[in-house]
From Swiss-Prot:
UniProt keyword annotation of Amino-acid biosynthesis present: no
UniProtKB keywords: Aminoacyl-tRNA synthetase, ATP-binding, Cytoplasm, Ligase, Metal-binding, Nucleotide-binding, Protein biosynthesis, RNA-binding, tRNA-binding, Zinc
Binding site for Zn(2+): H582, H586, C685, H689
Protein known as: Alanine--tRNA ligase
Function: Catalyzes the attachment of alanine to tRNA(Ala) in a two-step reaction: alanine is first activated by ATP to form Ala-AMP and then transferred to the acceptor end of tRNA(Ala). Also edits incorrectly charged Ser-tRNA(Ala) and Gly-tRNA(Ala) via its editing domain.
Length: 898
């Protein structure tokens, strides 16, 4: 049974049982605790926790999942995979243990003719949590399982959670006995190679806290209601139903391996374990990489981007070690698309981007690998000659810093060469590099590279900030600096046309210097008296040693001389926008704490005219209801027109008043307090603010996202920018309503209806294509040619037939041709203009010397493509549809020569 059929039967079974089919979520969810989605229930967590009301009582899905902790084991064992599909059924306060067991058992054991998988009930076992007597009774009552095929196991095996705080509960796992060829008797407790887990039924009833291991965490209490979460491994079921030992031999992975085997000088499964590991790495990682890119990740040096980059680079290196010299990534991605596209349409619709990203990484890494490998070999040789088995941290750092080798790749190559790596030395050099980079960035941010140049001015005293009381100030120029060098004068030529950073240090300034999350003011400085022709735009203001204001300027006319008196003027519109943003930040902070509670503590902020960004400590994404509440509370406070008071007081007194302070920040003994609406908001703050909350204008929350583990970010527009954003959305909605010919409030329902109709139409189109193709295949089988005593079906199928469908049709035809020597060759033109083709050769024809993996190359040559496979079945893909007829003629000619 093919994998697509396994998926379909699962979903059909549960839809008939009253479940709503829910599409797979992206493998990227907005949860800082979760790198990738690793279980089918992840998208339903808010429903299990009672944070949101589920739109259905029962749901079913097949979720794409990524697990990468054991990436180094992929291929070495046949148990580890980075991508898998988890089929699941979910109950939200509806049925519980009995219903879950009944539904799982019927699907597994019902005959294939009745929509089930047809497993022999006598080969199925169950495990339950230690004290779950109810589950044991239900297995005996519902499934008729004898007590000797039900085993109790501890928390590590039969109490499920995601490994992080969230829903959890006891579980019951279903195992299939593969027979004595795979190990000793005694059930799952004795041997999990013989007894393979195929389905986990989780009785989700509790919420867990932090913990140190799978069986060491705190149970916080019961969930609002009892739920069911089950997970059936699609790939494991495919292995059993297809009669193969591991996922690499199944119908969705083997084509990737066969593709590479058709190119590499050494084949797969020829007794070379090292080569087989490399083939499996390519087969596994290609699927995972395509899925991750399809869900929006691009290669990078951190987090998910780093995982993707590592997967792609492991593919490339494995191919090189197999002797593949040509670029191969494009063909790998196309094969994954052909096999997985029917289940995950984004692999088809977004293929151009997926392919482009994968090929770009291949191109870049090929250059890196060539140069870096030479350096690695030299370093390894030097290490051996020195009588050592440890590659130095210096060498590992050079590979990383110069050639972009991640430490994981160096460790992998070293292990293959019989060496280890001085990881501690490497980490020390990396830490030193980060320290230097941080220091350089800080120097650039402060707009100076040599503090000694400013020392005289720093010692003379601070810049007096007048911006709380006025926007225009008469001031004296204390110093002029160009690229950190003190100069006596700067003119229009130097400041306006010549490159360089020009700064004025003033004794007094109305300009707010960037700090506390508020960006600097902009405005002008102009000369007075004899220097009145001098004018410059102020584009940035930074603090030097926290006391001097360095005004970055662009001189527009005249010249500025140290000691001159000038007029510094802040742009009033800029300042008004900045005050709106900063006061809006305080309002959003207060609203967050009102809605979420006191644990929503500020972790950082940024505000500029018309915009604010606020980071806060919080575990998990906010619900739509919470976001709406925060926005509403904020705007209610704006409408209330609260007065804004600023005053200076002692730090301890401010804290006793309840003033919020940024954790980790050092404050002086005397602090400035900003109070909005009495108790609504009171914070320590040195920024500029509106005089009353109504001056902020409307606040529109744009979104909420994760910026790190346990830190969330809210972004919003304020004032006129908020109005413009709302006007733009209103115009967009009006345009949609006009195009859809419905009132605005009916647009969501109309769009959902259209999407459902489109999906149904696409599904029906695929069904009709396959029906027509099966009819054509039946006719082709009936009209098989005879060439040299061998029956041949060489047929061009209708357009739009995928590679997976071709394989299914080949199987149908081969079955109809009986046991006489027969060859089936089918070719088609897919929707994306590629030309997939499949060749099957039965055993009788193989005995006559024919091989599918030879004949497939004949087809490939005619359509500008290539292929590979085994003696009985091979497939490939090309790009030249014009050559299809020639390809079929070539097959006939080749048969005539055999």
């Amino acid at each position: 049974m093919q994998t697509h059929e396994i998926r379909k039967r699962f979903l059909d079974h549960f839809v008939k049982a009253g479940h709503t089919e829910v599409p797979s979520a992206s493998v990227i969810l907005d949860d800082p605790n979760l790198l990738f989605v690793n279980a089918g229930m992840v998208q339903f967590v808010p429903y299990f926790l009672g944070q949101r009301t589920p739109p259905w009582d029962r749901a079913t899905s097949v979720q794409k999942c990524i697990r990468t902790p054991d990436i180094d084991e992929v291929g070495i064992t046949t148990r580890h995979n980075t991508f898998f599909q988890m089929a699941g059924n979910f109950s939200f306060g509806d049925y519980f243990k009995k219903g879950a067991i009944e539904l799982a058992w019927s699907l597994l054991t019902n005959p294939v003719s009745e929509g089930g998988y047809g497993f022999d009930p006598e080969r199925l076992w169950a495990t339950v949590y230690l004290d779950d007597d109810e589950a044991i009774e239900l297995w005996q009552e519902v499934a008729g399982l004898p007590a000797e095929r039900i085993q109790r196991r501890g928390m590590a095996d039969n109490y499920w959670s995601m490994g992080i705080p969230g829903p959890c509960g006891p579980c019951s796992e279903i195992y299939y006995d593969r027979g004595p060829d795979y190990g000793i008797d005694g059930g799952p407790e004795a041997n999990e190679d013989r007894y393979i887990e195929i389905w986990n039924l989780v009785f989700m009833q509790n919420e867990r806290g932090e913990g140190t291991s799978k069986d060491d965490f705190e149970i916080l209490g019961p969930l609002p209601r009892k739920n069911i979460d089950t997970g059936m491994g699609v790939e494991r079921i495919a292995c059993l139903l297809q009669g193969v030992d591991n996922v690499y031999e199944t119908d969705l992975v083997r084509p990737v391996i066969d593709l590479v085997a058709g190119i590499a000088p050494r084949g797969y499964g020829q007794g070379n374990h090292t080569d087989d590991v490399r083939y499996r790495i390519i087969g596994d990682h290609s699927r995972t990489a395509a899925i991750i890119i399809g869900d929006g990740v691009t290669p990078g040096n951190e987090g998910r981007g780093y995982v993707l980059r590592r997967l792609l680079r492991r593919i490339i290196r494995a191919a090189k070690l197999l002797g593949v010299e040509q670029p191969i990534m494009g063909e790998l991605m196309a094969t994954v698309r052909d096999e997985m596209g029917p289940s995950y349409p984004e692999l088809v619709t977004d293929f151009e981007r997926i392919n482009r990203i994968a090929i770009a990484e291949e191109t870049a890494f090929n250059r890196t690998l060539t140069a870096g490998s030479r350096l690695f070999e030299d370093a390894a040789e030097t290490t051996r000659k020195a009588g050592s088995t440890v590659l130095s941290g210096d060498d590992a750092f050079t590979l990383h810093d110069t050639f972009g080798f991640p430490i994981d790749l160096t460790l992998e190559m070293a292990a293959e060469a019989g060496l280890s790596v001085d990881e501690e030395g490497f980490r020390g050099l990396m830490a030193e590099q980060r320290r230097r980079a941080k220091a350089d960035a800080a120097a650039r941010k402060q707009a100076h590279t040599d503090l000694s140049a400013y020392r005289e001015l720093v010692d003379a005293g601070p810049t007096e900030f007048t911006g709380f009381d006025e926007l225009t100030t008469e001031a004296r120029i204390l110093g002029i600096f160009v690229d950190g060098r003190r100069v006596p004068v700067v003119s229009h030529v130097q400041g306006g046309d010549a490159p360089g950073r020009v700064e004025l240090i003033l004794n007094r300034s109305p300009f707010y210097a960037e700090s506390g999350g508020q960006i600097a003011d902009e405005g002008t400085v102009t000369g007075t008296g004899a220097s009145q022709t001098a004018k410059a735009a102020v584009t940035d203001v930074q603090k030097i040693a926290k006391t001097l204001w360095a005004h970055r300027i662009t001189v527009e006319s005249g010249e500025f001389v140290e000691g001159d008196t000038i007029v510094a003027a802040v742009d009033p519109r800029w300042r008004h926008g900045a005050t709106q943003g900063h006061s809006g930040t305080h309002m959003v902070h207060a609203a967050l704490r009102q809605v979420l509670g006191p644990n929503a503590v500020q972790a950082g902020s940024l505000n500029r005219p018309g915009y604010l960004r606020f980071d806060f400590n919080w575990q998990g994404a906010l619900s739509d209801d919470q976001r709406s509440q925060i926005e509403e509370v904020t705007n209610e406070a704006v409408e209330a027109d609260y007065e804004v008071h600023n005053f200076t007081t002692e730090l301890e007194k401010a804290k006793s008043m309840g003033a919020m302070a940024l954790f980790g920040e050092n404050y002086p003994d005397e602090v400035r307090v900003v109070e909005i609406g009495g108790p609504f908001s009171i914070e320590l703050c040195g920024g500029t603010h509106v005089r009353s909350s109504a001056q902020i204008g409307p606040v529109t929350i744009l979104g909420e996202s994760s910026v790190g583990s346990g830190v969330r970010r809210v972004e919003a527009y304020v004032g006129l920018d908020s109005f413009r954003h709302l006007a733009k959305e209103r115009a967009l909605m009006a345009g949609l309503a006009s195009s859809l010919k419905v009132p605005s409030d009916e647009v969501p329902a109309r769009v959902e209806n259209l999407v459902e109709r489109l999906r149904a139409a696409e599904k029906e189109l695929d069904r009709l294509r396959l029906v027509n193709a099966r009819a054509a295949a039946a006719n082709a089988a009936a009209g098989a040619e005879q060439i040299g005593g061998i029956r041949l079906v060489a047929q061009r199928m209708a357009g739009g037939i995928s590679a997976g469908d071709l394989r299914s049709l080949v199987g149908d035809i081969r079955g109809k041709l009986g046991s006489d020597p027969a060859v089936v060759a089918l070719i088609s033109e897919a929707d994306d203009d590629t030309v997939p083709f499949v060749v099957a050769v039965n055993q009788a024809a193989q005995d006559r010397g024919l091989r599918a993996n030879d004949l497939v190359k004949v087809l490939g040559a005619a359509v500008n493509g290539r292929g590979g496979g085994k003696a009985d079945l091979a497939q490939g893909s090309g790009k030249g549809a014009a050559g299809i007829d020639a390809a079929l003629a070539a097959i006939r000619a080749e048969m005539g020569r055999s």
